[in-house]
């Protein structure tokens, strides 16, 4: 018994509440972002290309999600899943935007892509990643305990197949580029989003933000982002599906657009409003509401030859400390042993006056409003997305940190004050790229 207690003692400790501005990682971030210089080179051109690659397995594989889905194979295919890519080039800088119909962009996939994506095509640091955050798509990509909790038994072939599809989508998009114009679109959809963390006590991010492209030959593409979680389909429904983003993308492509892409926005604490007779009716209703917002958006045309800059910066953090109780946490070495250790980073892409910032987490929609307003004072339209290729759990508003809730206990892995810290990270990027 004494030996057991000693072993347990080596694995647990108390939560560290040291203010983040007193921590070494904060100073490290300030040093990293301080070295970023705004790219002032004049654009000579603006071209865009897009492509998609079907990643639907030929036979059932484990799904990544929660509840009944956790590690179990899907039973039927409701709708196919894809990787989609948009490649943009202004004559000086080239970058890619990639979204996959997955729960997240898995760190295991990012690791493969860091070797696969080289300067010959588009290097990893010039690729902006996101996902639709469907909870009914391909698993098998998580190592250690993360596989047990989220994605089923680890399968390196699944990781390689996803990475290869992303690579091929970028190559295909790059091979078919045309001169194009760029626009920013913004509208509100207050009817299809709720605060699932604290209900009416908290706020929501109801903005539907989109980037539109139209080529000289009249082809149209649109990238849209919204904050409501892709959790319409219940966990007992064992189907492969993109959830409501799939219905949205298909509807946009059957209407005014030749190509559509969806990226989960600041989905932390944000849930959909489920209205309908069954899961699939609810998906259609949710997608219809978001689509109506997209189609009624205010449109801001960008410069014919927009400036462009892409950055990928390491994101320093305090050591991981996942909670066992609200005050007792696992030591960092236990977490790393159980979940693996992967690089963490923040990605940002500025195209004209549009600034996209990708975070390695479920980033809370409650944190976006002030950032959006701040960006507009700097002349920028901000789009914050989650699941950039790293993953650290949920980042929620700090005022909820001591609440015994799923997002703030089970999925809070890196200690206190991260709401404030991550907001500061994004403000620093706004300042540097404005």
Protein language model regions, located:
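Anionic-ligand-binding alpha/beta catalytic cores of soluble enzymes and soluble regulatory domains
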Residues: 290-293
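Accessory structured domains or lobes within enzymes
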Residues: 297-299
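Conserved beta-alpha junction segments in alpha/beta enzyme cores
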Residues: 2-4, 9-130, 137-259, 263-267, ...
């Amino acid at each position: 018994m004494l030996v057991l207690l000693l072993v347990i003692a080596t694995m647990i400790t108390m939560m560290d509440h040291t203010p983040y501005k007193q921590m070494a990682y904060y100073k490290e971030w300030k040093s990293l972002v301080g070295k970023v210089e705004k790219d002032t080179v004049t654009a000579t051109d603006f071209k865009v290309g897009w492509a998609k690659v079907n990643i639907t397995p030929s036979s059932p594989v484990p799904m990544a999600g929660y509840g009944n889905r956790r590690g179990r194979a899907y039973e039927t295919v409701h709708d196919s899943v894809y990787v989609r890519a948009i490649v943009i080039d202004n004559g000086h800088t080239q970058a890619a935007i990639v979204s996959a119909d997955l729960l997240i962009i898995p760190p295991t996939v990012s690791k493969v892509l860091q070797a696969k994506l080289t300067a010959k095509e588009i290097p990893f640091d010039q690729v902006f990643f996101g996902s639709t955050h469907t909870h009914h798509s391909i698993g098998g990509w998580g190592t250690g305990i993360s596989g047990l909790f989220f994605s089923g038994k680890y399968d390196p072939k699944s990781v390689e197949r996803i990475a290869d599809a992303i690579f091929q989508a970028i190559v295909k998009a790059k091979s078919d580029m045309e001169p194009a114009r760029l626009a920013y679109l913004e509208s509100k959809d207050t009817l299809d989003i709720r605060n699932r963390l604290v209900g009416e006590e908290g706020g929501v991010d109801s903005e539907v933000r989109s980037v539109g492209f139209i080529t000289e030959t009249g082809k149209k593409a649109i990238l849209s982002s919204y904050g409501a979680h892709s959790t319409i389909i219940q966990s007992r429904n064992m189907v492969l599906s993109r959830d409501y983003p799939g219905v949205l993308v298909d509807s946009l492509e059957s209407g005014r657009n030749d190509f559509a892409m969806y990226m989960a926005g600041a989905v932390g604490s944000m849930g959909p409003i489920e209205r309908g007779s069954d899961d699939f009716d609810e998906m259609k209703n949710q997608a219809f509401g978001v689509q109506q917002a997209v189609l009624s958006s205010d449109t801001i045309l960008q410069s014919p030859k927009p400036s462009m800059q892409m950055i990928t910066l390491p994101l320093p953090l305090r050591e991981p400390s996942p909670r066992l109780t609200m005050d007792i946490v696992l030591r960092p070495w236990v977490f790393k042993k159980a979940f693996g250790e992967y690089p963490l980073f923040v990605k940002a892409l500025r195209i004209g006056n549009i600034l996209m910032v990708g975070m390695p987490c479920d980033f809370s929609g409650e944190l976006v409003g002030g950032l959006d307003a701040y960006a507009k004072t700097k002349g920028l339209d901000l789009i914050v997305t989650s699941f950039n290729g790293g993953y650290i759990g949920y980042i929620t508003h700090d005022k909820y940190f001591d609440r015994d809730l799923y997002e703030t206990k089970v999925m809070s892995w890196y200690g206190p004050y991260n709401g404030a810290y991550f907001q500061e990270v994004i403000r620093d990027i706004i300042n540097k790229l404005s």
